[in-house]
Each structure stands twice: as C-alpha cells, then as structure tokens.
Amino acid sequence: MSAKAIKFNHHAREKMLKGVNILADSVKVTLGPKGRNVVIAQKYSRPIITKDGVTVAKEIELIDPFENMGAQLTKEVAFQASDSAGDGTTTATVLTQAIVNEGVNAISANMNPIDLKKGIDKCLHYALLELNLLSQNCDNLEKAEQIATISANGEEQIGKLIAQAMERIGTDGVVSVEDAQGYDDELIFKEGLAFDRGYLSPYFINNHEKSTVELNNPSILLLDDKLTHMEDLLPLLEKLANNRNPLLVIAEDINNEVLSRIIGNNMKNNLKVTVIKSPAFGSRRTEILQDLAIYTGGTVISPEIGMDLSEVDTDKLGNASKIIITDSNTTIVHGEGDPQLIMQRIKQLNSQLLNSSSEYDQKKLAERVAKLSGAIAIIKVGAATEVAMKEKKDRVEDALHATKAAIKEGIVPGGGVAYIRIAQTLASLEGDNPDQSFGIKILLKAMESPLKQIAKNAGNEPVEVLSTIKKQTGNFGFDAKNDRYGDMMEFGIIDPTKVTRCALEFAASIASLILTTEVMVADMEDNNANHANHDHAHSLNCSH
C-alpha cells in the first residue's frame, strides 16, 4: 500500500511553475559570452565549475515532488536540445520559463489553456517559416570557426581546431574529443571509416568507462545474409579458435538464439566475437558491404553468388588495427585493404556521383566517398585540473555539434537577434479568438527572453538593449562580449539555424504540456501519509 498526494488545477500549476523557475534560474545565468559560472558539489570528488547549461540541469533534483516535476520537465527541454542540436540548452530553458510564467498568469486570469496552446502552436508554425527565410548557408571555414568559438563560450583556439577538423573530414566524418597529456589543445587525424550501426547487446561492452566495444587487431566477417543458425558459424570459429584476436561479424540480421549463444561463448572462450547489423538496406546495403570489404581487405560472403558461410576460410576475412563500437556507431580504424583498390573504388563512386540525376543518390554516394577516403579527427583537450578538463570537454562537444548543425542547416544572426526579428515580423498575427491571440503573444514575448538574459548576464540593462535593437532592422544586435551594437554577421556572432529552431520547438512543446496540466500525482512521504495537505492535496491509497 502506498499513499499518493494529488494536486489539482491552479495548485498543480503553481507547484510546477516553482520547479520550472528554480531550474531555469540555475541554468540561465550561464547564457551568453559573459555567462556566469555554476559550482556543483560532488559527493566523492572536487566540485565541478561549469558554464554548460545542460550540465547544470542534470544535477538538479528538488525535494518537493510536485516542484520536482516542473524541474524535470524543464530539464527534458535541455536534454532534447542537446540531443538534437548539441547546443541551445540554456536558450531552450530560458524560452520555456518565459512561456510557462506568462501562460500560468493568463490561466489565472481565466483564459482557456487549450486555446492558449493553440495560439502558441500557431505562432510556432509561422515562426519556423520565418526562421527558414532568415537562414543563410554556412559555406566557409571562417563562419564555421565563428560558430564553434561562440558555442565554446568564446574560446578561439577551440573554434579554430573544430573548423579545421570540419574542413578536412566534412560533417559526415568522425570527430572524437579526448584528454590531452598536457595543458595544450591539439588536433590530430587518424584514418578510419565510420557508419551508423551499434552493438546489439551491452554484454559486448569491454570498455565500461566509455560504454563502448573496443576491438584491437580484429578479423571481420562480412555477411550479406541473415545469421540464423549458430552451426553455420561454428566451422569458422573453430578455425579461429587458437587466434586471440577478436572477430567482428557484420550481418543483415542476427537470430536472438544465435546472439545469446555468442554472448555465452564469449564468457567461456578466448575468442571474443561481437556482432552488429549491416549498415543501410536492400541493394544499398550490399554496396556498402562491398565498400567495407575493399577497405578491410575482406570478401563479402553472399549466398547469391554461391558462397556458404559454413565453408568460409579465414582468408575471406577483413582486418583492421582497431574497431570502436558505441550504442549507435561503428568506426573501423586502419582497414588493411589494398590502397590501390580503395582508390579505384573511390573513383568508381565519384563517377556514379557525376552521372546520377537523383539528389538522394548523390548525397548517399558522396557520404560513401567521404567515408572511404576520410579520416577521423581527434581533438585533444588540455587543462590544468581534472575538473577543468571535464568542463572544457563539455564545451568542445557542444561546439562540435553546433558547428555540424550550422554546416548542415545554415546560420542566423546570433545573440537572440533572430528571435527578435521573427517576433517583429509576426507582431500582427492573430488567433481565432482572444485567448488564442494571447497564446500567440505569449510566444512572441518569450522570444525576447534569450536576448534580455544575455544582456543581463553581461551587466547591461535588458530592457534598454532590447529597445535599441527593436528600433533597428536586419542583423543589427548587441555584442555582449565587447559591449557594442552593430551587424551580428559582421561581428561573427552567429547561431546555427538548427539550434535556434530546436530550442524554440522543444520549449513551446514542453511549456504547452505544463500549461495544459490539470492534475499532478506523487508519492506521499510516510510521515504525511495519514494527513491531507492543507493546500488541497488529497491522499489516495493504491495497492500494488
């Protein structure tokens, strides 16, 4: 038996609002080039000092379960922004807080939450259309460097390294961030081929700190078929029994029983076998398997050309110096294929690319060329202490994701200016009724909040800065770092369109969810289980 505390309508929203504000107030101080630090206590180590919004959000859990729901929903906005665009977490949090506060006030004034949500949704739709019109291509190294520098909280060295990495390997290449041995940052390149397929079971993980599978000097079986019977694989495993090098099997699909037996064998035998699914589907999968075969010096085993897995010898296997597998990605480092055959394959793919009339096919062929010829970039991050190292690596990861997003989806003027221009354009937008129109105004007003917070964190008067920018047009904005006004594009203060879009989308979505919440249910503490809360909470006994 467990007692539940329940809150209804405005009592629920007020508690949730308090949680939203506690989390947002903790996160938003980090926004902008003069964002403040947040110090986070660690139970068994030194405190973390960070200016990374999502790092702060992760640490916040509130004692009051109802307030905590508001905090956790706001935290979800930061996580979604981070996962989708790699940056914009603090902006998304600031937007959410602004929408929720205005919305709760409107509901308290007897406005309809559903109509408010419809107004917010309508405004969001048109705001995203305007954002696309504002967006420009990120088509040169200088712009990429500016994006990376801004996302790394103004560290120009990090911006340079990320831009150089992007120039060399492109947006589809692999960039990893690692600890440096000393204090200096550096960029190094290694050969490698990566594709979007991860391990099929956590039991394959052998680097538990990074939650990855790392195979040194592995053999590689490329199977253009489903692996449905363990007996088909056993003859090859017997031939490799005395080989201490691991085996990676890449197959179209793997039967669950076969997967279980492989995991069981790994626990008993010296030969460690890892299985992943082939990248892509259909004929494209067959072509990519052939790319992998050429890159690793192996042969694709396919029943369509009369090859039987049970008769495969070890000379058909590919090889590499290392393979790293995450939950979603596999990277083959230093495949042992013939360099001349690899170059011939690249020329063949480039020829297909030139002759293709399909935009989709061109994109996929270009990706394959990049992967066959591309390198893996490694950014080594240096710092004086372990705490500083972790904080810096977080910023490099953010900057890396933001730069990739900018190259793929374009850029807009930064510093909150894009939102201001969109809000000005949509100032006359109306809903189907007064409450919907007010919902539109809620989102338009919320779009002013990132710029105001950037100005506040820089020690300026937010209303004054906002007023000055509204009197101008286009890219005119406020450079908080250097305390000046002017063209944000010329200043190099730019944001990825994707980051700007995702922050607004996720903030509007979660805020609307909070505003349309009427009931909250939480576990009641034992010492309160027999008492009703004085603020209209009710207890409900539930048996499990």
From Swiss-Prot:
One of its GO terms (molecular function) is isomerase activity. One of its GO terms (biological process) is protein refolding. It catalyses: ATP + H2O + a folded polypeptide = ADP + phosphate + an unfolded polypeptide. It is found in: Cytoplasm. It comes from the Bacteria. Keywords: ATP-binding, Chaperone, Cytoplasm, Isomerase, Nucleotide-binding. Its EC number is 5.6.1.7. ATP binds at residues 30-33, 51, 87-91, 415, 495. It holds the Pfam family Cpn60_TCP1. GO terms for cellular component: cytoplasm. Forms a cylinder of 14 subunits composed of two heptameric rings stacked back-to-back. Interacts with the co-chaperonin GroES. Belongs to the chaperonin (HSP60) family. Together with its co-chaperonin GroES, plays an essential role in assisting protein folding. The GroEL-GroES system forms a nano-cage that allows encapsulation of the non-native substrate proteins and provides a physical environment optimized to promote and accelerate protein folding. This is Chaperonin GroEL 3. It comes from Psychromonas ingrahamii (strain DSM 17664 / CCUG 51855 / 37). The gene is groEL3.
